[in-house]
């Protein structure tokens, strides 16, 4: 198919934290329309593509994105108008060449990604198929197991927990719809437990609670209690996943990790995680970013030790970048990768990373950012790529729920063709 792009425009809008971000709208010659809003992270990897901010302290504390908007309207739009909306690979190649830098620092990854996503949306509308079918073809049918971030710590909360996310993983549910119900029921049960214990139950950036618990281990214990009280079996119906975001508690001067009030070497941290896995076996199923983003040695040792039974996810380690992923595959540094569109900055590069990981036998976890919007692109992306897993926040805050509701609609639309793999989605480990 060949349908020309006839108009591209961007504007500054707000994300879920009240910070500016880029929205892009694309119009095609047949009247088809697509729009996209770019998300933004709080704990960002140092190797991520650059999110361009204005730096004008008098406006949005320097976080405005008028430069990125201008780059779309003045530089990108004239170059992509007239291109075929159905040639996503060529479109993204043009965008990368237009920028010409390794980390998209000239035009901004937020400018490039907004256009890339909006064109994909417009093309799917022109083709008369949902976005997941357009990106993934006729075989796009696997609904992802949700990773629900219900207890927040680290950079996502002002509390005593070092580990950034404690997540519910309802891999024992028979369908996505039921998985969502399992998670919601535990979320409400958890709220009551925390409230009864005298904790504040206001929610953080991703919709989870941020209680001042005594230790990271107590957070795991409270989650297990909530799972049981909600009527489910931990390690069978619902599992627990951790996002340690260890770069945030790594001390560059000492080369050690500050966790639970003590300093640990990489080897000592491996023992700490191994203790948690064994003590709560088989409940902990996935650990993300257990080490600092350049501590390849600890990743390799940890994967050798527990990678057969626990999913070890590289986020800051890989930043959805095929060059870093290649190194990880070569070293066998992890058995899974977190996928974030805005870490790399285009749809094609994101799909390339997913494909490379799959070919290497690694799992893919499609992910949101802490600064999100009402955009549901990642829900379609998860189904399009049959990734089998998605991480998109807690069971509150409508920018998180928007993705879950989109997945409910997709599951309903697919009907009997829909597959929820549950534990089978974790194909890089044996359980």
Swiss-Prot record:
Q: Which E.C. number(s) belong to this protein?
A: 4.2.1.11
Q: Name one GO molecular function term.
A: phosphopyruvate hydratase activity
Among CDD domains, the record links this protein to: enolase (cd03313)
Keyword line: Cytoplasm, Glycolysis, Lyase, Magnesium, Metal-binding, Secreted
The EC class name is: lyase
Q: What is its main location?
A: cytoplasm
The residues that hold (2R)-2-phosphoglycerate are 164, 340, 369-370, 391
Instruction: Give the catalysed reaction(s), semicolon-separated.
Output: (2R)-2-phosphoglycerate = phosphoenolpyruvate + H2O
Residues holding Mg(2+): 243, 288, 315
Q: Which cofactor does it need?
A: Mg(2+)
Protein purpose: Catalyzes the reversible conversion of 2-phosphoglycerate (2-PG) into phosphoenolpyruvate (PEP). It is essential for the degradation of carbohydrates via glycolysis.
Similarity comment: family membership: Belongs to the enolase family.
Q: What is the name listed in the Swiss-Prot or TrEMBL entry for this protein?
A: Enolase
**Organism, scientific name:** Fervidobacterium nodosum (strain ATCC 35602 / DSM 5306 / Rt17-B1)
The taxonomy runs: Bacteria, Thermotogati, Thermotogota, Thermotogae, Thermotogales
């Amino acid at each position: 198919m060949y349908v020309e792009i006839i108009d591209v425009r961007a504007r500054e809008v707000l994300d879920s934290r009240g910070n500016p971000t880029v929205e892009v709208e694309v119009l095609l010659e047949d009247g088809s329309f697509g729009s996209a809003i770019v998300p933004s992270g709080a704990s960002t990897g140092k190797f991520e593509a650059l999110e361009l901010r204005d730096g004008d302290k008098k406006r949005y504390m320097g976080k405005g994105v008028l430069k990125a908007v201008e780059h779309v309207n003045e530089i990108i739009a004239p170059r992509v108008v007239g291109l075929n909306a159905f040639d996503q690979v060529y479109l993204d190649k043009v965008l990368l060449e237009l920028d010409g830098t390794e980390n998209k620092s000239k035009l901004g990854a937020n400018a490039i990604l907004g256009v890339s996503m909006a064109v994909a949306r417009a093309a799917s509308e022109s083709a008369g198929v949902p976005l997941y079918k357009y990106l993934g073809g006729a075989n796009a049918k696997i609904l992802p197991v949700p990773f629900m971030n219900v207890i927040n710590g680290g950079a996502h909360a002002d509390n005593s927990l070092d580990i950034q996310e404690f997540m519910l993983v309802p891999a024992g549910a028979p369908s996505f719809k039921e998985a969502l119900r399992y998670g919601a029921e535990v979320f409400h049960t958890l709220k009551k437990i925390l409230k009864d214990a005298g904790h504040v139950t206001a929610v953080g950036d991703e919709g989870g609670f941020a209680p001042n618990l005594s230790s990271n281990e107590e957070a795991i214990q409270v989650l297990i209690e909530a799972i049981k009280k909600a009527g489910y079996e931990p390690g069978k119906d619902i599992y627990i996943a951790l996002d340690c975001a260890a770069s945030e508690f790594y001390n560059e001067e000492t080369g050690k990790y500050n966790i639970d009030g003590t300093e640990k070497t990489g080897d000592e941290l491996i023992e700490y995680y191994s203790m948690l896995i064994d003590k709560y076996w088989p409940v902990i199923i996935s650990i993300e970013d257990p080490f600092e983003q350049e501590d390849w040695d600890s990743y390799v040792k940890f994967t050798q030790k527990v990678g057969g039974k626990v999913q070890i996810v590289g986020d800051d380690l890989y930043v959805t970048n095929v060059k870093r992923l290649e190194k990880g595959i070569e070293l066998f540094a992890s058995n899974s990768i977190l996928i974030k569109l805005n870490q790399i900055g285009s749809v094609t590069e994101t799909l390339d990373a997913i494909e490379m990981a799959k070919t290497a036998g690694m799992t893919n976890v499609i992910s949101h950012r802490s600064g999100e919007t009402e955009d549901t692109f990642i829900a379609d992306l998860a189904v399009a790529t049959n990734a089998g897993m998605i991480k998109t926040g807690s069971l509150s805050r409508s920018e998180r729920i928007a993705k879950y509701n989109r997945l409910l609609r997709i599951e309903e639309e697919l009907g009997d063709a829909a597959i929820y793999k549950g534990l089978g989605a974790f194909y890089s480990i044996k359980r």
